[in-house]
């Protein structure tokens, strides 16, 4: 027991991975008379500081909302824009039924892996956003940095190694980005913001039940 206590309070214990181990090794006693569902839930590795994670995602969503509003006012890129064709070429991550993030077929491990890989895939799009956004640069930078930080928090919580995006896909996107005119840049930025917003909103709902 002493060796476990010593390792738990080493500097490395501040990582999310060891926090999860500590949470499993030292479960909080539940109320008397709890049902089997509560017992099963308590045995799953919980998200570390779930409330803080939710607040962090809401912070990013607030920045996205501000950028979308600015895009709508300055460049008329609003929710009713017809941009489906451009979206098909961007390979923007989405959460689908098979990702097991929806309540009807929820699976924590599968969902957490997909959220993490999705945020990883968004990185090239958010670098583009930061480099090309012509409005509030601080908000654009905040969305990029905050999403990257969220990814860093989630990565060690996965039981399996999270794969990196295919370099061929990244190269194709880079070529597409370089060929865009100003109008198409605005369309692309709007689509990135909208897709990231949807992805984070679904992720937020999933994290609430983890």
UniProtKB/Swiss-Prot annotation:
PROSITE patterns on file: INTERLEUKIN_6 (PS00254)
Superkingdom per UniProt: Eukaryota
SMART domains: IL6
Alphabetized Gene3D superfamilies for the sequence: 1.20.1250.10
Cellular component terms per the entry's GO annotation: extracellular space; interleukin-6 receptor complex
Disulfide bridge map: 72-78, 101-111
Sites of Phosphoserine modification: 81
Its job: Cytokine with a wide variety of biological functions in immunity, tissue regeneration, and metabolism. Binds to IL6R, then the complex associates to the signaling subunit IL6ST/gp130 to trigger the intracellular IL6-signaling pathway. The interaction with the membrane-bound IL6R and IL6ST stimulates 'classic signaling', whereas the binding of IL6 and soluble IL6R to IL6ST stimulates 'trans-signaling'. Alternatively, 'cluster signaling' occurs when membrane-bound IL6:IL6R complexes on transmitter cells activate IL6ST receptors on neighboring receiver cells.
Protein's recorded name: Interleukin-6
Gene behind this protein: IL6
């Amino acid at each position: 027991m002493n060796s476990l206590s010593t390792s738990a309070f080493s500097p490395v214990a501040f990582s999310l991975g060891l926090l999860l181990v500590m949470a499993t090794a030292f479960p909080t006693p539940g109320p008397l008379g709890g049902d089997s569902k509560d017992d099963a839930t308590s045995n799953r590795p919980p998200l570390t500081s779930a409330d803080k994670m939710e607040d962090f995602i809401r912070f990013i969503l607030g920045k996205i909302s501000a950028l979308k509003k600015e895009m709508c006012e300055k460049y008329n890129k609003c929710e009713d824009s017809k941009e489906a064709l451009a979206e098909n070429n961007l390979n923007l991550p989405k959460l689908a039924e098979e990702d097991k993030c929806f309540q009807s077929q929820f699976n924590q491990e599968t969902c957490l892996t997909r959220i993490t890989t999705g945020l990883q895939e968004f990185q090239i799009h958010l670098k583009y956003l930061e480099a090309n956004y012509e409005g509030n640069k601080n908000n654009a930078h905040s969305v990029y940095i905050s999403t990257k930080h969220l990814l860093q928090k989630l990565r060690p919580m996965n039981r399996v190694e999270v794969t990196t995006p295919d370099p061929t896909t990244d190269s194709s996107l880079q070529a597409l980005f370089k060929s865009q005119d100003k109008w198409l840049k605005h369309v692309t930025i709007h689509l990135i913001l909208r897709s990231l917003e949807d992805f984070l909103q679904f992720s937020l709902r999933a994290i609430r039940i983890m």
